[in-house]
Structure formats: structure tokens, C-alpha cells
């Protein structure tokens, strides 16, 4: 099992700063290595069931998914620079710019994101939480932590507010914190990250993925719909009257 760099080990457990949103620049307001890491060159029609025929040949391969010019793998817990890079990608995606002292507040926001990431890496079993990172496919260069330009979190959960819609299901994987660097958006990286979540769901033996998006974030909802997610519920109307609160939709994707 991997470990965190000693200099990053003492992290508090803050509330994660961006529940139910995606860092795709549309609306800025959920294994150490798996025992079965998969290198999957995905076609749009390829199903997860095909993986059962190839596990033996794929056990030693590094990436969960490789498509559209992106490779997706698990975050390297031993790489302090990579951990900080991931927190920067997420902070830049979810930070809401301010008119005054923006740099100052961004610094604190990034520190909060980093603290939340460290807490989850330190306290979550390796088969219950994974931070997946995307980097550009390169066959000639050695990629460094600075090459990480996309990230998504996947966490095993048992919230009754979600499971009540799925009788017989005891737990699910929650997808959150999907973030893509501004310079790399509209290049199908987010779709590739979501495909990696599908693969991880299969490898861990789960049958259900869930996530939340803002109701008025059409781009994010279209992304999730195209990835196979469907709306399960929408927040009640009265929630939109709360100051600073926007209505969200719960979306899910189920595997047979």
C-alpha cells in the first residue's frame, strides 16, 4: 500500500469545498493501485463486459483508460509534487474569482482543497477511494507531475438519500471533483475521466455510479448524459430560495 509523503502527512479533515459540481469552466460556484489496473483503449461502442476476457493480460499495465489522447491512472500517493498539482487543478476549476484580494483568497482556497485531498488519501481504504488523474498521452517523453491536467474523485458511499432509489443496492461509487485545466477543455478529457470511473466501478465490483450537478449547468448535465447517466431526482423548489444555494440534480449510471 502506498503512503503519503511525510511532509504532507498531517492534514485536518475539512469539508470538501465543492460538493455536486464539476470544474469544467461552465459553472464555477465523489487501490494503492488496484489489483487489476487496466489499460483500455475505448471505442464508443465498447462495453465493460469485454474486460473479463482480458484481465490476465492487463494486470501489469498502468492506465485505467487511454483514449482521445489522454491517459488516466490513479494519483501517485508517494509524489508530493503530483498531490499539490492535483489540488491546484481542482482549486483553479472551482475557485470563484473575487473583485478584491483574489490572489489572497485563492491561496487559502487551494490550501483547503489540498487539505481535503490529503485527508482522504490518508484515511480512506485504497478500495473505497481513488483520485484519478489525466495526463496527455506521450510515447517519447517522461511525464512529470506537472503533466497532470485533469482529475476526478471516486468514493464508495452508502447514503440512504441515494440508495432509496435503488432497492437491493447496498453501496455505490460517488463521482465528484471533476476538474479539467482551462487550457485543455473541450478536448474530451472529461469524457475520458468518466470512462475511467466506469472501469474502476467494474474492477471494484460495484454496480452503481452516482453524481450531482447543478440543475442549470446544461453543459455538465449533457456531458454526464452522454456518458450514460440519467437524472434520478432534483432538489425541491424551496431549496433555491436559500441564499447562495442552487438546485442540484442527482444522476446515476447502473451496470447489470
UniProtKB/Swiss-Prot annotation:
Its main location: plastid. Residues 1-41 form a transit peptide. Acetyl-CoA binds at residues 178-180, 186-191, 217-219, 224. Coiled coil: none annotated. This is GCN5-related N-acetyltransferase 10, chloroplastic. GO terms for cellular component: chloroplast. Protein acetyltransferase with dual specificity triggering both N-alpha-acetylation (NTA), with a preference for leucine, methionine, serine, valine and to a lower extent threonine and alanine as substrates (can also use glycine), and epsilon-lysine acetylation (KA) of several plastid proteins. Oligomer. GO terms for biological process: N-terminal protein amino acid acetylation; peptidyl-lysine acetylation. Belongs to the acetyltransferase family. GNAT subfamily. InterPro entries: Acyl_CoA_acyltransferase, GNAT_dom, N-term/lysine_N-AcTrnsfr. Pfam families: Acetyltransf_1. The active site is at residue 224. It is found in: Plastid, Chloroplast. Its EC number is 2.3.1.255, 2.3.1.48.
Amino acid at each position: 500500500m502506498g503512503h503519503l509523503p511525510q511532509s504532507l502527512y498531517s492534514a485536518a479533515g475539512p469539508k470538501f469545498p465543492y460538493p455536486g459540481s464539476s470544474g469544467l469552466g461552465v459553472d464555477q460556484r465523489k487501490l494503492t493501485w488496484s489489483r487489476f489496473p487496466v489499460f483500455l483503449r475505448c471505442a464508443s461502442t465498447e462495453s465493460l463486459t469485454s474486460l473479463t476476457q482480458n484481465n490476465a493480460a492487463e494486470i501489469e499495465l498502468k492506465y485505467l483508460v487511454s483514449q482521445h489522447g489522454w491517459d488516466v491512472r490513479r494519483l501517485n500517493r508517494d509524489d508530493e509534487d503530483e498531490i499539490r498539482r492535483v489540488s491546484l487543478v481542482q482549486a483553479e476549476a472551482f475557485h470563484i474569482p473575487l473583485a478584491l484580494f483574489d490572489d489572497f483568497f485563492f491561496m487559502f482556497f487551494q490550501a483547503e482543497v489540498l487539505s481535503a485531498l490529503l485527508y482522504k488519501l490518508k484515511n480512506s481504504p485504497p478500495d473505497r477511494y481513488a483520485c484519478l488523474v489525466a495526463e496527455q498521452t506521450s510515447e517519447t517523453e517522461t511525464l512529470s507531475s506537472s503533466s497532470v491536467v485533469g482529475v476526478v474523485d471516486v468514493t464508495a458511499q452508502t447514503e440512504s438519500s441515494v440508495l432509496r432509489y435503488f432497492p437491493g443496492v447496498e453501496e455505490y461509487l460517488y463521482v465528484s471533483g471533476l476538474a479539467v485545466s482551462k487550457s485543455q477543455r473541450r478536448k474530451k478529457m472529461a469524457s475520458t475521466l468518466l470512462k475511467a470511473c466506469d472501469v474502476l466501478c467494474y474492477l471494484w465490483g460495484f454496480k452503481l455510479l452516482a453524481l450531482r450537478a447543478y440543475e442549470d449547468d446544461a453543459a455538465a448535465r449533457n456531458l454526464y448524459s452522454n456518458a450514460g447517466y440519467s437524472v434520478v431526482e432534483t432538489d425541491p423548489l424551496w431549496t433555491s430560495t436559500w441564499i447562495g444555494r442552487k438546485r442540484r440534480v442527482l444522476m446515476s449510471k447502473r451496470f447489470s
